[in-house]
Amino acid sequence: MEHHWGLITGNKEKVPLKSISVTLSINDFVAAVAATLHYENEEKVPIEAMFVFPMDEDSAVYSFEALVDGKKIVAELQDKTKAHSKYEEALSQGHQAYLLEEDDYSRDVFSCNVGNLQPGTKVAVTLRYVQELPLESDGALRYLLPAVLNPRYQLSEQSASSCLNVQKPIVPLEALPYTLSMVATITSQHGIERVQSNCSLSPIQYLTDDKTSAQVSLTEGHKFDRDVELLIYYREVHSPSVAVEKGMQDKKRDSLMGAPCAMVSFYPDIPEVNASKVCGEFVFLMDRSGSMQTPMRTEENSQLRIEAAKETLLLLLKSLPMGCYFNIYGFGSSYEQFFPESVKYTQETIEEAVERVKRLDADLGGTEILTPLRNIYKTSSIPGHPLQLFVFTDGEVSDTYSVIREVKLNSKKHRCFSFGIGQGASTSLIKNIARVSGGTAEFITGKDRMQAKALGSLKLALQCALDDISLSWELPPGLSVNMLSPEQPTIFRGQRLIIYAQLTGPMPQAESRGAVCLKHTLQGKSLENKVAFSLQPKENANFTIHRLAAKFLIQTKDLGSHEVSKEEKKDVMNISLQSGVLSSFTAFVAINKELNKPVQGPLAHRVIPRPMIATSTSMFMRSCSRLTGPFKNSRLKRRLCAADYVPYGHESTVYSSMPSPAPIENQGVADSSNEKSNSQNEHKAFGENVVLQLIFLQNANGSWKLDENLTKILGTTLEDTKAANPSQHGDPSAWATILAVLWLHANGQDLKCEWELLERKAVAWLHDHAGRGTTPPPFPSFHLHPREPCLYVLQRTQESLWLSQLCCLRTLSLQLILHFQD
């Protein structure tokens, strides 16, 4: 009987990757990360280890090195074609070789190859990168270390050269054969209020009395079976800031990396505006591929993605303003649309749309988003109704560049709000289609509710944004600014503006200060934010600001090797090689020439297993015979296609979980019992949620009809409800609408962010229609806030008995009617 010792995969192969250690340094709004992969070959033959992993597409990878038997081997960034050739040649000569590259078809997927790893050899491979930290809606900065890489569907014309084509072993999450350790140091002039995480962390340690520096770490033995998320809350996040960084001494003074570089950050506190009567064309593009049958989480009774998507569509439809236009597309291998073209928002069209939403299913096969996108863009625009596109997908598309390019080509006539569903959604796809069109991107993971995220973005779409944005600089004579970031025409409420610029000319010797002024308009009113800063550049060994600026320039020009011109490719190559930041045209390669053992036969190839979110749809990749391009006959390409891509069956289905963030200040471990109870109470099948049933009944204009369907939800009879109406001769819909709004406050408070917009529409309708032609009798006087019409009743009634005190409701309703008449 054969025995397998050590860590093995489900295929009985020993795993060369033993652990991953991450050192994270967060300074204000940016993060510097060093990730070390520890390999050991326990086999009796030389091997080549390949590790395919996801990384946020905004990450600027700038360093790759290996430590072998105490010797450091630093990789060089080269043209990708040359790097591949050098790697292959080194292996053929018996040298040890290392290769790190970005995938040809997706900017957020990387592969790390360790070639000719001799028996008994231990190697530590370290890659370093920097990135901007995105903002959450509540002002938190979010750092995400992604663990899950979903299977990605391939476009028909795609080459098999992608590392996504590699058959990656799947193992049960609890048996994942490597661990993760992470230490995070956080420093901010804004002051650190608290830190939260979805994983078990050590108690937070403040390193300074003023709480401007802190440290946290993952608890020992953490399995890399879920995305690791940190949420950092600063005390004064809206304060503008400017940081100036010294350039490299060995670079030309006026070059990208030689000149001082400034990063300007504005996070304006834009007031919320009631925008219930906003014109626009709202198109919702919903993923209906087989992967949408995947549960949102692994907990028992977790809601399916498609069910959450249907609820989300319903809430979005009910929250749209009267007078707008809308349409809904579903896409998979093919696509369907509700209407031939966008229709006006009326009671008839909304009723038809709601009925069709109820019948939606994840039944359209694979993921092909380009065709419906092109159909949307070729449709004639509606005068006076700018297009707002909402895209929902789990991101399982390989060729993200083609999709991004299509959105960018049409960016001047629309905004795109994108949503990545589940762990493993492509950050490259989701972020870039929003970025190039001036919209926003959201990721729905762990216990995030798709409904809440989508309604939050709709609020942004309905809000008045900052327009006519311009920057002006106040600098000493002789010093000028070269803007590296293009102009951003608008800033939405909750968005942050980060700008990169070069300072050219002689820097002042003595202490001197400059200033930046951001001018903009809000609803026709001119406003400005001004911040002063020191002109003495600070040294930074990582050159974080310079490399983030270089990454920004690369992102604006690099749409993949198959989508850019020769001139654009040349520009990207120059920026990448000058800054040391990885691009789709470059790769890191390192050779250990001290090892000179000729390889006898092919190296044993080992692909490191990852936690995978399997789908219910079979996915097939092209065979190796269809390879094209400069690597057609290379050994690396032959390795990538050693086996056809095997569809995942039910027997290998593994889901990754992500519990809700738990505060770690004063505690290190989240309460698992609370998580369990929350997950059990949260899920309802589509249509079973009573709050949703009430929302189903709302009319397009925001009102509710007084009928038995409504009173059944309210827990009373139609006769009793009519008898309790304080305005017997008025419109009964006013009474029904008041009761519906009160019921939502009493019974759906935990989901308020999801029905807040449709409540505003209801209140606006009451303001225009309630109490016409009525003369209400005297009633007790009390203060009523127009934004909180139910507080009086809620203070006097219990949730389960709220309709039993109809006299209070009558009194409140009379006050409401008078208030709206005024």
Swiss-Prot record:
Q: Where is the composition biased (Polar residues)?
A: 669-680
Query: Which residue intervals define the domain VWFA in the entry?
Result: 281-469
Q: Which cysteines are joined by disulfide bonds?
A: none
What SMART domains is this protein classified in? VIT, VWA
From which residue to which does the signal peptide run?
none
InterPro entries linked: VIT, VWF_A, vWFA_dom_sf
Q: Does the keyword Magnesium apply?
A: no
Is Lipoprotein tagged as a keyword? no
The region called Disordered is annotated at 657-682
CDD domains tied to this protein: vWA_interalpha_trypsin_inhibitor
* Residue ranges the record marks as coiled coil: none
Keywords tagged on the record: Tumor suppressor
Q: Which domain of life is it from?
A: Eukaryota
- The VIT domain sits at 1-131
Function field: May play a role in tumorigenesis as a tumor suppressor. Altered expression of this protein and disruption of the molecular pathway it is involved in may contribute directly to or modify tumorigenesis.
Protein's UniProt name: von Willebrand factor A domain-containing protein 5A
Q: Which organism is it from?
A: Rattus norvegicus (Rat)
Q: Which gene produces this protein? A: Vwa5a
